[in-house]
Amino acid sequence: VPGRFDYLLHANDLLSKIEGRRARMLDIGTGASLIYPLIGTAAFNWECVGSEVDKEAISYAKGLIRMNASMLGTKIRRQEFKSNILPGIIEKKEQFDLLVCNPPFYKNKSEALAANARKNKNLHGKEQTHHNFGGSANELWYKGGEEAFLKKLALESAEYGSQVHWFTCLVSKKEHVRTFKRFIRKGNPTDLKVIEMTHGNKSSQ
């Protein structure tokens, strides 16, 4: 949670002072925990919309909203097509001040399993026979991995430039930043920033 809060703090710094209304945030791949809408609502009083492809995650997320009075205005939209990120989620003439996204890290389940095994070995000195993932399949892997997801998001964002003031995304691997920037520039953005975040032994951009 601290790392996610740091991300939203940096994102909040990008927003111009908004008067007379709540800022609107779109969370891509919000997951069952709704962590970004939870933080966005509690810490910044944002109006939040989350997108998700997994039906079970959506059901659980809607349950969280019903149990939390401060989040009753939060909306969850299902992405019907896994090949899309933004189409079908951002409605015509709809405006968002901010988009946030924590993309899938891995290309497939095998890559995720291997990374999890390395992590356990580094932490415990041996490989564990069980696998404990901190997220669902949709949150952890995407065909082509993080780099492919970033390319897709960059290209799709160009189609919604008049509807979203700031597109933001965490990038876990430094080597992907250059690729991401190259594809973002194809859409002729008004501004482009790379902000380094460090929490513990982890670094993100």
What are these model-derived regions, one by one?
Residues 61-62:
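Conserved SAM-binding loop
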Residues 20-22, 45, 95-96, 164:
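A general structural motif
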Residues 32-46:
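Conserved SAM-binding loop of SAM-dependent methyltransferases across substrates and taxa
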Residues 20-32, 49:
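Conserved class I S-adenosyl-L-methionine
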Residues 58:
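Mixed-charge (Asp/Glu-Lys/Arg
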Residues 1-18:
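S-adenosyl-L-methionine
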Residues 53-55, 67-194:
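S-adenosylmethionine
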Residues 200-205:
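Helix-rich interaction surfaces within compact, conserved domain-sized segments
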